[in-house]
């Protein structure tokens, strides 16, 4: 039996985690077990779709792989960022020569910004209750 070639990348953004698998194919998207025509059916927003697919578009590999994505946590914006990092890391497994191009465009950097925790005595993370002088 022929061995299935697969490239795996994990991406995280805010509280979202995406596990991305690329298999040589005709460009299908399978997100959380559902086959979709394109990523817009899942993300619903053109800007998020462009954001998520930037590594594949930049490296001209968009139609060459079937993309299997398991994504959980967070909202759609965070999930788009997680998918983007996952695709970039999987493409790096496919071809190490893409590293300078991906790195130059900031696609291999994990965005470390997460929500700051709420502190006691404050209304939000930094918002203090209104101060009254008298």
Swiss-Prot record:
A GO cellular component entry from the record: cytosolic small ribosomal subunit
Keyword Zinc: no
Keyword Ribonucleoprotein in record: yes
Source organism superkingdom: Bacteria
Keywords annotated in UniProt: Ribonucleoprotein, Ribosomal protein
GO biological process: one example: translation
Molecular-function GO term, any one: structural constituent of ribosome
Alphabetical list of InterPro entries matching this protein: Ribosomal_Su5_D2-typ_SF, Ribosomal_uS9, Ribosomal_uS9_bac/plastid, Ribosomal_uS9_CS, Ribsml_uS5_D2-typ_fold_subgr
Classification via HAMAP family: Ribosomal_uS9_B (MF_00532_B)
Similarity comment: Belongs to the universal ribosomal protein uS9 family.
Protein name in the entry: Small ribosomal subunit protein uS9
Annotated organism of origin: Kosmotoga olearia (strain ATCC BAA-1733 / DSM 21960 / TBF 19.5.1)
Gene (UniProt): rpsI
């Amino acid at each position: 039996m022929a061995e299935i070639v697969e490239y795996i990348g994990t991406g995280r953004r805010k509280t979202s985690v995406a596990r991305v698998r690329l298999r040589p194919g005709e460009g299908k998207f399978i997100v959380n077990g559902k086959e979709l025509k394109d990523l817009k059916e899942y993300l619903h927003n053109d800007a998020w779709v462009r954001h998520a697919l930037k590594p594949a578009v930049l490296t001209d590999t968009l139609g060459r792989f079937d993309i299997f994505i398991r994504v959980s946590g967070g909202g759609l914006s965070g999930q788009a960022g997680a998918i983007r990092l996952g695709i970039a890391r999987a493409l790096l497994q496919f071809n190490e020569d893409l590293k300078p191009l991906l790195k130059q465009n900031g696609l291999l950097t994990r965005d470390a910004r997460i929500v700051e925790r709420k502190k006691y005595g404050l209304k939000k993370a930094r918002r203090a209750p209104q101060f009254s002088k008298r």
